[in-house]
C-alpha cells in the first residue's frame, strides 16, 4: 500500500491492525467494548532525528515491518478515506515476526 504522506524526523506511519471482533470462545465483541489494537504495519518511515553533531540517527524499522507500539502512543489521522496512526520511533516497542 502506497500513501501520499511523508513522515518527518523520527515519525512512523502505521496502518493499525483490525480490532478483534470475536473472542476465542466465539462471542462477538460490540464496537464500544473493543480494545484498540497495539499492532500494525509500517507504511512510511521518516529519515530519523539528528544527533548533537547534526548526523541522522538511523531508524530501526522499515516499510512493511509489523510492529507493536505503545498503547497511548501516536496520533490518529484520517487521510483520503483511510485511518492511520503516526507514532514516534520511541513509541515502537517491538518488530513482530
Curated annotation (Swiss-Prot):
Alphabetically, which GO biological process terms does the record hold?
Answer: chaperone cofactor-dependent protein refolding
- Report keywords, A-Z: Chaperone, Cytoplasm
Q: Which SMART domains does the UniProt entry name for this protein?
A: Cpn10 (SM00883)
Gene3D superfamilies reported for this sequence = GroES chaperonin
Q: Which GO terms describe its cellular component?
A: cytoplasm
Signal sequence range = none
Which terms in the Gene Ontology molecular function aspect does this entry carry? ATP binding; metal ion binding; protein folding chaperone; protein-folding chaperone binding; unfolded protein binding
Q: Which Pfam families match?
A: Cpn10
Q: Where in the cell is it found?
A: Cytoplasm
Q: Which domain of life is it from?
A: Bacteria
The UniProt entry, under InterPro entries, shows:
Chaperonin_GroES, Chaperonin_GroES_sf, Chaprnonin_Cpn10_CS, GroES-like_sf
Role summary: Together with the chaperonin GroEL, plays an essential role in assisting protein folding. The GroEL-GroES system forms a nano-cage that allows encapsulation of the non-native substrate proteins and provides a physical environment optimized to promote and accelerate protein folding. GroES binds to the apical surface of the GroEL ring, thereby capping the opening of the GroEL channel.
Alphabetical list of HAMAP family matching this protein: CH10 (MF_00580)
Self-association and partners: Heptamer of 7 subunits arranged in a ring. Interacts with the chaperonin GroEL.
**Which family does the entry's similarity section mention?**
Belongs to the GroES chaperonin family.
Its name, as the record gives it, is Co-chaperonin GroES
Amino acid at each position: 500500500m502506497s500513501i501520499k504522506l511523508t513522515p518527518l524526523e523520527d515519525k512512523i506511519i502505521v496502518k493499525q491492525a483490525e480490532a478483534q471482533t470475536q473472542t476465542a470462545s466465539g462471542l462477538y465483541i460490540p464496537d464500544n467494548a473493543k480494545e484498540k489494537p497495539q499492532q500494525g504495519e509500517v507504511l512510511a518511515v521518516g529519515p530519523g532525528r539528528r544527533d548533537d553533531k547534526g548526523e541522522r540517527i538511523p531508524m530501526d524499522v522499515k516499510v512493511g515491518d509489523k510492529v507493536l507500539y505503545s498503547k497511548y502512543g501516536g496520533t490518529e489521522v484520517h487521510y483520503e478515506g483511510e485511518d492511520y496512526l503516526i507514532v514516534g520511533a520511541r513509541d515502537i516497542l517491538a518488530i513482530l515476526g
